[in-house]
Amino acid sequence: MVLQKRPDYGFNGYEVPHTPRAARSPRKSAFKKKSENHQISSFDLLAAVAGKLLLEGGNSSSSSNNTSGNNEDQCAVKKEPLNGGDIMVEEETTNSDHDNNNAERSFFVSEILQKSHEMQSFNRSPSPLKEFHFGSSSGITSDSSEKFETQELAYDESKINNGDCYRSESNDKKSMLGGLNFEAKLSRNVVGKDEKHIGSGFRKPIPQNPSTCSDDVDLHGKENDDGENFSACYRTKSFRSTLRIGDRRIRKVWASKYCKVPPKLKDTTVTNSDLDLKSDYYSKKHCLKSLRSERNYPIKKRRYFDGYTASQSEETNKNEGQSGSPRKASAFLSSIACQKQPAAFQSPRDSNNVKLGIKSFRVPELFIEIPETATVGSLKRTVLEAVTSILGGGLRIGVLVHGKKVRDDSKMLLQTGLSLDTLSDTLGFCLEPNPPQSTKPLSPEDSDFARPCNVPHTLTRCLPSPGKHAKPSNSVESDLDSKPSAPNRGKTIYSRALIPVSPLHAQALTVVPPRKTKRSEVAQRRIRRPFSVAEVEALVQAVERLGTGRWRDVKLRAFDNAKHRTYVDLKDKWKTLVHTARISPQQRRGEPVPQELLDRVLTAHAYWSQQQGKHQLLEGPQQLETSLGL
């Protein structure tokens, strides 16, 4: 028996209610699975049973006539062997006075199959099974839970035309609300006869082999005019009930560690009304949505492996999140280049070591005093001796952390806040002269003027202290209370010579004195340096010879060796002397100047003032003639 599918499921008079669709993810799997291991479905089983029963037409027709006019509730069970197995068909009928109420029919078939492949071949073979008949008696369960008696199965003529089901309605009875659904379920346990009460729904048996009951059979029928016979139509249900789907769909969606798998639906009460189906389905649908929305999936934590292993990452976590990525920082003058090697390439012993590379240091400023009578060669030798004394062991290292000097050399790096993640701008170094060997002003007696010029002078190499960062620092502080630090053990020293100089002769060495900043020059100018009596006498003598209008010549003649005296200073001093000579002695301030020098100042000032006036009178007509071209 082959059924043809139509968009309306092959029925003209009755339309199947709208099927609620499940979530997207359960729809990915097929609703039906083909029976495996040669197991037939319930529809094929019913077709085979109907074919066997149609062969005995006499018995079925007689039983149909007997049950048509009988008003009593009857139930009969016919049992026939089929291919070595027993098949028992039971139908329960209940007559109720309420014709307008909905009725539910249950049709139970239990079977024990031994040769299922023979049943499949029997179903697919061409046979006169296209027309088969059922009687008007059916298994109907009412809501009133009335007792019922047995009634024999009867078969009557019915036709199936391309899957269409049709029959006439009686004039004295109203059409039933909803279709009469006969759901055939296969079970290996035979339904007993002694069941007398069935509620509004039937208790659905859970088959032991789900593949044998994958299809449902619906029997839609309406009474004829005589109220005796009706036509039946078998078809495969286009959808499964919610609870049948629950074993596959709902359990599939609930299969997570946050959702508990529901128990097997053995004692679940099922109603066949469309309203109950929709409400039951949508209630579970919303429940599933709420469960899915409340899932708290664990956040996947990304691990960034930046050149270190898991064991080393634990060590870095203990050291307050020390990173293993390489960092480079370089600066000039008083800066360093800090290169942190990746921890993956270091041994566990050296994983917490801080390796630094100091590129340069700033030499402290040198202050040297030398008399005016010293020669250039003596000046060179003096500067060379000062530099040699500093670089030869007169320096010490000062450590600055965040601009503050660390005076205790016995502290650990972690105690001072220095670790692998320390930035290069938090640490600084400075070169300081040792207190006992600090540079002192050199006098002519201290300088060795008698040293021959061919004596070689070499500069020693000073190795900076490794193991720390450096920061530019302009301040030079004395570290008097610092303690000697213990030498580093097992650490490689990365250092360069500060000034690697080969042995040279003093004559070939040109030492440029450190250039003083503009600020220092301004500070030296602001220092008040009064003229002495000798300097005043030298100034008066030079002005008497050269005049008051030649201050540059006066500077070169009288104050050539005095670098701190400029020609502007000489001019200002001359004006001050003229003003001092003109006022009374009681009004004068500063160092007293002899009256004889003041008289000479007035005489020289009056003379050069007259000479300057005469020179202007003589040069005036000559410049006018030259400008006019005469």
Curated annotation (Swiss-Prot):
Residues 57-71 have a biased composition (Low complexity). GO terms for cellular component: nucleus. Keywords: DNA-binding, Nucleus, Transcription, Transcription regulation. Residues 309-325 have a biased composition (Polar residues). Residues 551-578 bind DNA. It comes from the Eukaryota. Disulfide bonds: none annotated. This is Telomere repeat-binding protein 5. It comes from Arabidopsis thaliana (Mouse-ear cress). The gene is TRP5.
